[in-house]
């Protein structure tokens, strides 16, 4: 069975960016394991389950899976995960990743081994793309020269204030686009497109929540996974 590891933030993951790929992969009979930095259950960003923000259907779906999914409620510690055990590693986004996953040494190791090694593939979504700015391979940035998309500055401007404070009062540590560009990535968030998913070798990146479904389908294609046969 094809296996996947979801590395999810304890400081606020964006619901759709985790739940859409997770449920899609499971519907295609992939085995899913969830890891968090400390092994505590991940925390959903409340803005991503606000019906006024994301719509009632999405909000209800995310809450239902968040509350009842066995792996989300009993994750493994990130330090115990090894890339060789999985065919793909998924890094859902959310501003919370900037405080834990993106700067976690074990997350960087997993990403590096999946993308630069032979252990599998990686799907990195939205703010989690910032992880690429902190991941090095042979002394250089892993993302150097690679085509990527991610959460753009233009969108961030509509969320934080002039002091980079978020609606919940936290100060954003950095802007994803700025950091990933500084790591010499070939950045294009395709702002004129409805969705944005980019494939560069074993690295798949997705722009944001609206690209989550396409990102999941792209990962399935890259893994050569076909839809399960009807009973």
Q: Can you say where each PLM-predicted feature lies in the sequence?
A:
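Extended, subdomain-level signal for the structured scaffold at the beginning of enzyme domains
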Residues: 1-120, 130-231
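Short, thiol/selenol-centered motifs that function as redox-active sites or metal-ligating centers
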Residues: 124-128
